[in-house]
């Protein structure tokens, strides 16, 4: 609780909440940044309640000024004042307009501020919803000297009931509730020297929890010490404090009654949070598996694309040079050994066993392989016969399936006759 009692103060007192002071300072700083150094003062209305000679200032809002140039006489919009006051009355019926505040660069009430205070008083008294007050309160905050001294440069003035042109200083007392102290403490911790805080979110949360537990422990120790002093006769009993302590003890019994239910609920929540924490990991693992599968599929598609039969043939020699070089690790050679032979395939794929040559089978004499270059050579010499043989081979391959091996094309009789004639001519 802070007290400011200037000389000449009377019996009137003002109970001032921290929210009003914070809003006054924020209003001046924000306007100064937005409009530049030309702004010297800012004005706003104070909301609160009055109980006899005691006035309590709880909240405030900004007034809409008619001009921005402080060199000329300024005034505020009465329509905006009454509209905002009616809106607050709908939400908080106990709050009414009790005065005017000004945040500037001086301490005293200036001649240009007195007409504003008189205008606000007349507007409030003529309105049915804005509220009725005996004397208008005026708060003046010197934002220039704020922070240079330990004393808050805030001054309170009250208009005389008989003469509204006269104002006298009154004392003000800083009061706050438990929720307001927690909020102010939180804002003070977040506000650093350069607007930066190197602490992590987890560390801040842990510190807040530790501070709350420490405060609870201190309050419990204080209550226990007070009860011991009362029991010993050192202190006189205060029935209000004893009543609050009794209510707290009754709440402890309620907590013990629902301890088992609380434990079950806590365990269920813990399991749920554990499952939720595992879901991102499972999603990551599934993504990695999908990437591996995509790579394997791409490799398989690459191997099938290199197949001479476009992946439709499953015979052991229907694989080109690239597949053979990738499988055996041999350099690529564009010669007649472009295909796997039986010996290479059996030694590499099946391990050492008895070698079975194609000639051992009954069809070995007619099912022999000829390299592509030899087939092309015979095709050029035989003319139409080679083309006919290729058409027959393609038809037979479709009928017999992928295990069909084309027969070796044989030279025609015309080719033998031509060779005999050439030998006789020579």
UniProtKB/Swiss-Prot annotation:
Segments of this protein annotated with the region Disordered:
320-426
For this chain's UniProt record, which GO biological process terms are given?
Answer: cell cycle switching; oogenesis; regulation of oogenesis
Question: Which PROSITE patterns does the protein's record reference?
Answer: MPN
Give the domain of life: Eukaryota
Claim: Nucleus is one of the keywords in the record: yes
Domain called MPN: residue spans? 14-155
**Which Pfam families does UniProt cross-reference here?**
JAB, MitMem_reg
Q: Does the keyword Nucleus apply?
A: yes
**Bias category Acidic residues: which stretches?**
334-347
Q: Kindly list the places in or outside the cell where this protein is found, as annotated in its UniProt entry.
A: Cytoplasm; Nucleus
Q: Which InterPro entries match?
A: EIF3F/CSN6-like_C, JAMM/MPN+_dom, MPN
GO MF term set? metallopeptidase activity
**What would be one Gene Ontology cellular-component term for the protein?**
COP9 signalosome
Keywords tagged on the record: Cytoplasm, Developmental protein, Differentiation, Nucleus, Oogenesis, Signalosome
Self-association state and partner proteins as the record states: Component of the CSN complex, probably composed of csn-1, csn-2, csn-3, csn-4, csn-5, csn-6 and csn-7. Within the complex it probably interacts directly with csn-2 and csn-4. Interacts with rbx-1.
As for what it does, the entry says: Component of the COP9 signalosome complex (CSN), a complex involved in various cellular and developmental processes. The CSN complex is an essential regulator of the ubiquitin (Ubl) conjugation pathway by mediating the deneddylation of the cullin subunits of the SCF-type E3 ligase complexes, leading to decrease the Ubl ligase activity of SCF. The CSN complex plays an essential role in embryogenesis and oogenesis and is required to regulate microtubule stability in the early embryo. Mediates mei-3/katanin targeting for degradation at the meiosis to mitosis transition via deneddylation of cul-3.
What remark does the entry add?
A: Although strongly related to metalloprotease proteins, it lacks the JAMM motif that probably constitutes the catalytic center. Its function as protease is therefore unsure.
Q: Which family does it belong to?
A: Belongs to the peptidase M67A family. CSN6 subfamily.
Tell me the protein's name.
Answer: COP9 signalosome complex subunit 6
Question: Whose protein is this, by species?
Answer: Caenorhabditis elegans
Gene encoding it?
A: csn-6
């Amino acid at each position: 609780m802070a007290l400011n009692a200037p000389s000449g103060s009377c019996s009137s007192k003002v109970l001032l909440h921290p929210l009003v002071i914070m809003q006054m300072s924020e209003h001046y700083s924000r306007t100064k940044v937005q409009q530049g150094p030309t702004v010297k003062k800012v004005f706003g209305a104070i909301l609160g309640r009055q109980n006899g000679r005691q006035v309590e200032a709880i909240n405030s809002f900004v007034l809409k000024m008619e001009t921005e140039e402080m060199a000329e006489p300024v005034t505020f919009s009465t329509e905006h004042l009454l509209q905002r006051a009616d809106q607050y009355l709908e939400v908080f019926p106990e709050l009414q307009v009790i005065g005017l505040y000004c945040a500037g660069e001086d301490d005293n009430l200036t001649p240009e501020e007195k007409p504003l205070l008189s205008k606000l008083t007349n507007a409030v008294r003529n309105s049915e919803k804005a509220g009725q007050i005996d004397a208008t309160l005026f708060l003046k905050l010197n934002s220039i000297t704020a922070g240079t001294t330990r004393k808050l440069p805030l001054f309170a003035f009250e208009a005389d009931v008989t003469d509204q042109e006269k104002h006298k200083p009154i004392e003000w007392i800083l009061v706050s509730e438990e929720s307001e102290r927690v909020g102010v403490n939180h804002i003070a911790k977040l506000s650093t020297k350069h607007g930066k805080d190197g602490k992590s979110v987890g560390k801040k949360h842990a510190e807040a929890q530790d501070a709350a537990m420490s405060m609870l422990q201190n309050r419990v120790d204080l209550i226990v010490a007070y009860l011991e002093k009362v029991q010993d006769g050192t202190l006189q009993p205060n029935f209000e404090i004893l009543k609050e302590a009794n209510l707290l003890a009754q709440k402890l019994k309620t907590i013990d009654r629902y301890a088992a239910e609380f434990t079950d609920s806590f365990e269920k929540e813990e399991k749920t949070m554990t499952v939720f924490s595992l879901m991102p990991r499972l999603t990551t693992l599934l993504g990695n598996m999908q990437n591996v599968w995509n790579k394997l599929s791409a490799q398989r598609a690459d191997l099938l694309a290199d197949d001479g039969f476009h992946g439709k043939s499953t015979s052991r020699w229907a694989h080109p040079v690239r597949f053979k070089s990738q499988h055996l690790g041999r350099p690529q050679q564009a010669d007649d050994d472009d295909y796997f032979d039986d010996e290479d395939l059996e030694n590499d794929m099946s391990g050492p066993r008895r070698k079975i040559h194609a000639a051992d089978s009954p069809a070995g004499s007619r099912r022999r392989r000829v390299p592509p270059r030899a087939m092309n050579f015979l095709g050029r010499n035989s003319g139409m016969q080679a083309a006919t043989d290729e058409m027959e081979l393609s038809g037979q391959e479709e009928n017999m399936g992928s295990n069909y091996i084309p027969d070796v094309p044989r030279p025609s009789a015309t080719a033998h006759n031509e060779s005999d004639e050439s030998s006789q001519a020579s």
